[in-house]
């Protein structure tokens, strides 16, 4: 049914669909096996929705090596939360990413390492990758790691992170990568929840010219965690004096010398877990998202091939970290499944200067560049002059990931980086989806600046009215984005908490998968992503739970209550703003330095930011902490965050209906506090 009250997708009215530029087609190595135009996409998409059994069985056999064939393509339903794909089929992820390419073309580059210091760059071939993966797998096997065990990986974006992941799954074990920017406490929470007995890390990391003391963080986080019996440590910097606990800590290079150069992979059931990846949840506690082997690998391979138009001769550059899903799917699994070199980038776009990305593209003749809008906003603001110094003509496809990209930034990206010669693929997907949900297929689907265009094969996308829960038919509608049927790469569960999985994704709208994002579908059926509709903030493409940040802040002994909201930010997409009310009599504006009983506002803010950095990580730090007397609440005691979000967005004249507030009198004081503590500092 079409609901008249739903707004039209206004920004789409003047957006013109664009065909791929001529340069894109001329620079393609070949067209065999790819989608040639939108009519072919529509035909195949229709088949993928109406006859998924035939469609996905053909693709699974084409793109993956199976040790034993699957007997049934799919089973289960969204409503029951019991989805399974490729039942009884057996395969190994490490074999599919490494062995088959090493046997066919051992000297072909597999991992192109771009180190923090460019003097440390090197390349690993598929043949060498097989040897190194086998040796690390041999170490883990000697320690008793077996099929179904979890192994935690706390490494920066270096080849050893990819090698460790592939070594774990070679044994049929489950990797749980923890982003190396997370604090000791966050690492501990994830290691304990996953039940990991082995942790893989390094002595130190290097990022932006700075040293990150990773082994020290691991030691702090795992202090008293008796379940961890072994820690494998890669020597990244070689700094002397790294503490090593006898019987628990072992150097990777010393242990690798004891192992054979080839270890056979363990065949896994298609539904065996491949990895856990913790993501922010609206309840505050991180969720260990479970992805399984067969379906996830197919999603990674298919989307990399068809969305990005990837050919064997290409070089793929994902400027993302394996600590997040983008690094998993499009820096590791997608490219390596297709036998394509992947660039492993350890540093930042600003180190040693803003030409770093473009030197990488020029040096390795990268054909694909995939990055979050945050990085492009930064370069647009302060690093644009560097772009023209480099030859970027090898690029054919530009990707955007992690958050919606504005039409203006899309145009800049297309013109300045692509020289109007590339296809820009704005992709929408999630940790839970495993691979792209909605994205243009380069060269086949015309693009529109600001739109993620059309659903990928098998993604039966729809728009739901958030009030009635009824699907909204037709075009030019707005609502909540959902998916009507299962797809191979979707997450299967939350680790040790399947009820939470069903409650979070399947129960909000029974019979549908709830993405948590709002969206519009324009007059052409193209999708426009609006952002989160739940209590999750997207900062620089990283999803952060507002509840987790609130729980961290309220741990401060003199904080009474706190509410965290996300607002639009020119650089990071969204920014974290924290409203904090204090216990009576705690704060004193004129407290003398060193006063033990009171604290100044600036000192308190500093304390709270350090608390967030220490407990969660620097990337979760609030942009501003606003101290208030009280928070706006309904008569049932619920904090009205939409009011705080409007105030922090400088939209106090658009607060809407406040009749349900029990303490509407606090609103003017909050507006004043925001004026003095946030807006005044921005001027």
From Swiss-Prot:
Gene Ontology biological process terms from the UniProt entry: acetyl-CoA biosynthetic process from acetate
Binding site for ATP: 402-404, 426-431, 517, 532, 543
InterPro entries per UniProt: Ac_CoA_lig (IPR011904), ACAS_N (IPR032387), AMP-bd_C (IPR025110), AMP-bd_C_sf (IPR045851), AMP-binding_CS (IPR020845), AMP-dep_synth/lig_dom (IPR000873), ANL_N_sf (IPR042099)
Enzyme class, first EC level, given as a word: ligase
CDD domains per the UniProt record, alphabetical: ACS
Name of one Pfam family that matches: AMP-binding
Assigned EC number: 6.2.1.1
Molecular function GO terms recorded: acetate-CoA ligase activity; acid-ammonia (or amide) ligase activity; AMP binding; ATP binding
GO cellular component: cytosol; nucleolus
Binding site for CoA: 207-210, 326, 540, 613
Domain of life according to the entry: Eukaryota
Protein keywords: ATP-binding, Ligase, Nucleotide-binding
Reactions catalysed, as given in the entry: acetate + ATP + CoA = acetyl-CoA + AMP + diphosphate
Family: Belongs to the ATP-dependent AMP-binding enzyme family.
Protein's name according to its UniProt entry: Acetyl-coenzyme A synthetase 2
Taxonomic classification: Eukaryota, Fungi, Dikarya, Ascomycota, Saccharomycotina
Record gene name: ACS2
